[in-house]
Amino acid sequence: EQTFDGTGYWLVSQRGKVFTFGSAIHFGQMTAHELAPVGAFAVSNSNDGYWMMTTGAPGLPADSGEGRRVIFSNQRHRVWLVEDDGSISGNFFVSGRADQPKPDTYRIFSKSRHTIAGHDDIRMEYMVRFTWGVEQAIGFHNIPIDGFGEAMQSEAQLGSYRSEGCVRLRDDQAAALFNWTKVGTQVVVVD
């Protein structure tokens, strides 16, 4: 796919690796898997990134629990909503932090439709808390808005490490996770 200015290209390999040339901007590595090969590739309308559509949802990580649960893979930058029968109700690209939370099994202990972080007036919606960091709870929520009213990252940047600890989702996907879970729902964190 050529950039709008005609001086760069995005190139996607059969395995989904994205290569950039010239003026094409690279916003993180996204790779396909044999269970979810690349089906389509498109440059965003603002020419600041790209989207890859896979032909199937990626499979669940090995050793990721049983029963109804949320699975968060930090290395894959992905969350799955898994039903009791093992079917997948949703899977979303996310942004977390490389070193937390630690791989383990947790339970959701609190949910808030709207919340403000304890510093810098950072606002979040659809907060679903499942563990604790050094000073604050860690959970799933939408892309936060800072004290100046600006989004702290773009949707195109989901799929890369951007957070100070929580797991960020697109607004509609954060709402879906919020509505799908309840206090006590299992959360399995894997690498």
Where are the predicted features?
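Short, surface-exposed charged micro-motifs
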Residues: 8-10, 69-71, 127-129
